[in-house]
């Protein structure tokens, strides 16, 4: 049920909004968040960036693979997970996903402010205005009226200049941690580092002094094993699994880390080389195409600059690698789904925390490795061998968990196989978890109808004060 807003709370909301408006009038001199400001000065780049809006299709990844609903039980990704679209949709899609809930005010909702961090040049603007302490404080809804410009110019470039930059302080700290400071990097390296501001694994800190801050788990290295050791060393978990009660890790989108492990990364072929090639405009000018997308769509400007093989041949090789990765992915999922249900059965049979601890550690490590491999959307092209290696270790660790579970269940008198319910569709899997999807969708639609227009109106008024 919706809470009625009292006069006191309404006044407080108005005060918060007014303070945001005042802050907007003092926008940072380092970041211009409005992409359209550059549409004349950098016409070709702007128009090609705007073309990312042509990736209109929304692909429901949970519908394609309902196993993931069970693997993310108790976490927002079990509600909604769609394949990524172009940069133009960054703000739209994070607003619309069921994962962000249906907040009714700036202090409501399931997710923190940090969930805006990869979505907009308004993020560096806010960090510059408020500091990281101010930006990261509070709920995701707090940023609704502030973060309205999609991923664009100010995320990767100095204000009004083609010069590349890191616009988020936590990224500079991460690059320093692995001994590759941006300030000392070559232009070629910088072309990938700017992408690493978002296309990476990250987590939200839980320490009192930096609660909610974004951090990359690179202190011990960027391989799946080293990040795993780091997370274990600080006893971090993203959530507790609803079935197995395992302390879980949710991988994000570690394209930078997996790219470094593949043939392109090891030969320093940058993200820009393949995804933002140099092209020629209608008036004969060379420019960097900002329609970030599949290299095969611009084969002559991307792959063909290095490869002598035909497009058809390389597409075939890539599809073959995708099929192998998918096959191993599904094997890992099959083992993990069974492990979660078997762990649930063990708890119900009276298993103790001491008995379950090594089992839950195996489940945690197995799913972390599965997730890191599949969350990197281009891994079959970037690092197929590494993906298969990681998924192989995931299968092994899930099998280790299941062997221990079989022994434990036997001690508890359960010798028959633990039944896995029908999870053949997204809806059936969500029903198994007791998720009221109808209510979640209705709440989201009300949010989109009642709250989003207010956010946009506040943003419009704030930006009208910009010079």
From Swiss-Prot:
Range of residues in the leader sequence: 1-27
Protein's GO biological process: anaerobic electron transport chain; nitrate assimilation
Binding positions (heme): 115, 118-119
UniProt binding sites for heme c 2: 153, 156-157, 290
Binding site for heme c 5: 264, 303, 306-307
Chain positions recorded as substrate binding sites: 202, 253
Its EC number(s): 1.7.2.2
Residues given in the record as Ca(2+) binding sites: 201-202, 250, 252
UniProt-listed PROSITE patterns: MULTIHEME_CYTC (PS51008)
Reaction catalyzed: 6 Fe(III)-[cytochrome c] + NH4(+) + 2 H2O = 6 Fe(II)-[cytochrome c] + nitrite + 8 H(+)
Keywords: Calcium, Electron transport, Heme, Iron, Metal-binding, Oxidoreductase, Periplasm, Signal, Transport
SUPFAM superfamilies: Multiheme cytochromes
Protein location: Periplasm
Listed cofactors: Ca(2+); heme c
Annotated metabolic or biological route of this protein: Nitrogen metabolism; nitrate reduction (assimilation)
Pfam family, one: Cytochrom_C552
Predominant subcellular localization, coarse grouping: periplasm
Highest rank taxon of the organism: Bacteria
One Gene Ontology molecular-function label: nitrite reductase (cytochrome, ammonia-forming) activity
GO cellular component, one term: outer membrane-bounded periplasmic space
Enzyme class: oxidoreductase
Binding-site residues for heme c 4, renumbered to this chain: 271, 274-275, 382
Function (record text): Catalyzes the reduction of nitrite to ammonia, consuming six electrons in the process.
Family named by the database record: Belongs to the cytochrome c-552 family.
Descriptive protein name: Cytochrome c-552
Name of encoding gene: nrfA
């Amino acid at each position: 049920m919706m809470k009625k807003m009292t006069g006191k709370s309404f006044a407080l909301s108005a005060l918060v909004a007014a303070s945001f408006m005042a802050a907007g009038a003092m926008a940072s001199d380092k970041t211009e968040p409005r992409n359209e400001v550059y549409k004349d000065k950098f016409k070709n780049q702007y128009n090609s960036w705007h073309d990312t809006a042509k990736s209109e299709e929304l692909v429901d990844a949970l519908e394609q693979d309902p196993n993931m609903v069970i693997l993310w039980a108790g976490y927002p990704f079990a509600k909604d997970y769609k394949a990524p679209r172009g940069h133009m949709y960054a703000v739209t899609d994070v607003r619309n996903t069921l994962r962000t809930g249906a907040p009714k005010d700036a202090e409501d909702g399931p997710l923190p402010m940090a969930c805006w961090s990869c979505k907009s040049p308004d993020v560096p603007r806010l960090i510059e205005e408020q500091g990281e302490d101010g930006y990261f404080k509070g709920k995701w809804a707090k940023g609704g009226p502030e973060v309205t410009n999609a991923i664009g110019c100010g995320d990767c470039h100095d204000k009004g200049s083609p010069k590349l930059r890191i616009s988020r302080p936590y990224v500079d700290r991460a690059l320093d941690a692995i001994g590759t400071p941006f300030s000392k990097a070559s232009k070629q390296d910088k072309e990938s580092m700017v992408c690493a501001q978002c296309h990476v694994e990250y987590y939200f800190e839980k320490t009192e002094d930096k609660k909610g801050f974004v951090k990359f788990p690179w202190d011990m290295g960027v391989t799946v094993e080293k990040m795993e050791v780091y997370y274990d060393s600080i006893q971090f978990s993203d959530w507790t699994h609803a079935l197995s009660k395992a302390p879980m890790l949710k991988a994000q989108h570690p394209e930078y880390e997996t790219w470094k492990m593949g043939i392109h990364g090891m030969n320093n072929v940058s993200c820009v080389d393949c995804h933002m090639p140099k092209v020629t405009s209608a008036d004969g000018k060379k420019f960097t195409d900002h329609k970030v997308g599949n290299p095969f769509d611009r084969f002559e400007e991307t792959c063909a600059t290095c490869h002598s093989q035909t497009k058809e041949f390389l597409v075939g090789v890539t599809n073959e690698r995708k099929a192998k990765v998918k096959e191993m992915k599904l094997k890992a999922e099959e083992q993990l789904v069974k492990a979660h249900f078997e762990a649930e059965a063990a708890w119900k049979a009276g298993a103790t925390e001491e008995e379950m601890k090594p089992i839950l550690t195996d489940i945690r490590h197995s799913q972390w490795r599965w997730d890191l491999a599949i969350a990197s959307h281009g891994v079959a092209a970037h690092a197929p061998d590494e993906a298969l290696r990681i998924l192989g270790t995931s299968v092994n660790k899930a099998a280790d968990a299941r062997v221990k579970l079989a022994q434990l269940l036997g001690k508890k008198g359960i010798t028959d196989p633990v039944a896995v319910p029908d999870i053949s569709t997204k809806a059936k899997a969500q029903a198994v978890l007791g998720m009221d999807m109808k209510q979640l969708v209705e709440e989201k639609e009300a949010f989109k109808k009642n709250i989003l227009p207010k956010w946009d109106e506040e943003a419009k008024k704030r930006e009208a004060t910009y010079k």
